[in-house]
């Protein structure tokens, strides 16, 4: 039985809020057990996760999604299914690219040992789990000064970032930091080999080498993409993306809006500062007010290589120009919140909700004041515990990549 249900016909995401039909997630595996105090900054974590609790929290998140009838696709299951359906050449290419990209760089001796170890796995699932988790000298039964011969991919539970669903296509990303760049190996593999994904247009390829991550990519409606200029995504990349989209006749977007946000390492994407939760309701962190700046790319009249134009609008007017009516802006922790509450709930990704339908969102229970403010504004909040998951610096939107949504009427 496929990871996709019978309704899934391919990538179809033309909004942030349309009823969620199919979504990609990844429950953190053994890879998070290899995070050590000395490597927190390098591995992009704020603290070491208690892994049993983190997995329980993730299961709660997934259960809430499944309760709504959403087809929840686990990344490992998708990679396994793709691998089992792929040609011998595609399987060999995946393994060789994994070895090429491994961190630390493998010596000839270690490369041979890792390759033999992976090829000896009794199941595809075991092979994939080791590729994600990392491989130790104990696994290989070799002597080495290094304990980890291949580093883990501990951020992979943030499935939002390696690629983004954009209309009927995808952008597959070149990620800012080495620890995450390897994650797109799996994105390239599934979109090149899975029968239900292989014909998906690519609007961005990581080979283009300019940094962009999925937490910065938003589809506000059929006409408008919104992309963050952040700690992880550059304006230069968005300019290249605009050119690629303009050149692709399958893509119907008419406008890209780039939004400048604070360049903080712990709040690294647009979705940690501003999110769309309903047809006219947006959640934002007031901390970003003095940093917000907006550029327009005209994909209709901007020529073959549209350029960014500073539109000079305030946030409310910018959003009105996209949705066609006055937006409701909800600040983190609610109107009149103290600076302390704003900073605390911004820190724990208080804007980073996943909309499962217009005006229905899921996110961490710990951001109590923001949850209350959303409910007061007519948003239904589905809370789940995330005290451990949040230490990886992401909330429900970060931990999900919609693959299909119903269109918003």
UniProtKB/Swiss-Prot annotation:
Gene3D superfamilies: Arginine deiminase (1.10.3930.10), L-arginine/glycine Amidinotransferase, Chain A (3.75.10.10)
EC id: 3.5.3.6
Entry annotation: catalytic residues: 398 (amidino-cysteine intermediate)
Subcellular location: Cytoplasm
Gene Ontology terms: biological process: arginine catabolic process to ornithine; arginine deiminase pathway
Keywords recorded for this protein, A-Z: Arginine metabolism, Cytoplasm, Hydrolase
Gene Ontology CC: cytoplasm
Record pathway: Amino-acid degradation; L-arginine degradation via ADI pathway; carbamoyl phosphate from L-arginine: step 1/2
InterPro entries with a match to the protein in the record: Arg_deiminase (IPR003876)
Source species, domain of life: Bacteria
Pfam families referenced in this protein's UniProt entry, alphabetically: ADI (PF02274)
Signal peptide boundaries: none
Protein name: Arginine deiminase
């Amino acid at each position: 039985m496929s990871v996709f249900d019978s309704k899934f016909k391919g990538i179809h995401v033309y909004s942030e809020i349309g009823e969620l039909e199919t979504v990609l997630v990844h429950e953190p595996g053994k890879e998070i057990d290899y995070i050590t105090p000395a490597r927190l900054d390098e591995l992009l974590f704020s603290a070491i996760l208690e892994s049993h609790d983190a997995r329980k929290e993730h299961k709660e998140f997934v259960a809430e999604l499944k309760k709504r009838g959403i087809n929840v696709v686990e990344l490992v299951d998708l990679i396994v299914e793709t691998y089992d359906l792929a040609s011998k050449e595609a399987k060999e290419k995946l393994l060789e690219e994994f070895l090429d990209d491994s961190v630390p760089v493998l010596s000839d001796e270690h490369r041979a040992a890792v390759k033999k170890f992976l090829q000896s796995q009794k199941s595809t699932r075991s092979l994939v789990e080791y590729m994600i988790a990392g491989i130790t000298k104990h696994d290989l039964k070799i002597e080495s000064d290094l304990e980890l011969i291949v580093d883990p991919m501990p951020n992979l539970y943030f499935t939002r970032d390696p690629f983004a669903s954009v209309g009927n296509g995808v952008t597959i990303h070149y990620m800012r930091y080495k620890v995450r760049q390897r994650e797109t190996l799996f994105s390239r593999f599934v979109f090149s080999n899975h029968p239900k994904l292989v014909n998906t247009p690519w609007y961005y390829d990581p080979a283009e080498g300019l940094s962009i991550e999925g937490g910065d990519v938003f589809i506000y409606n059929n006409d408008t993409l919104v992309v963050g200029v952040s700690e992880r995504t550059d304006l230069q990349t968005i300019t290249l993306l605009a050119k690629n989209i303009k050149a692709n006749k399958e893509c119907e977007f008419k406008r890209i809006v780039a939004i400048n946000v604070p360049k903080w390492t712990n709040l690294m994407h647009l979705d940690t500062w501003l999110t769309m939760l309903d047809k006219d309701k947006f959640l934002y962190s007031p901390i970003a007010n003095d940093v917000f700046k907006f550029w327009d790319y005209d994909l209709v009249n901007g020529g073959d290589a549209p350029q960014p134009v500073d539109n000079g609008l305030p946030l409310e007017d910018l959003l009105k120009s996209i949705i066609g009516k006055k937006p409701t802006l909800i600040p983190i922790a609610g109107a009149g919140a103290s600076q302390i509450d704003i900073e605390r709930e911004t820190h724990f990704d208080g804007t980073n909700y996943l909309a499962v339908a217009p005006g229905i969102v899921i996110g961490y229970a710990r951001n109590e004041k923001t949850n209350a403010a959303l409910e007061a504004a007519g948003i239904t909040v589905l809370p789940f515990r995330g005290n451990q998951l949040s230490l990886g610096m992401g909330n429900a939107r970060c931990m999900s990549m919609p693959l299909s949504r119903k269109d918003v009427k």
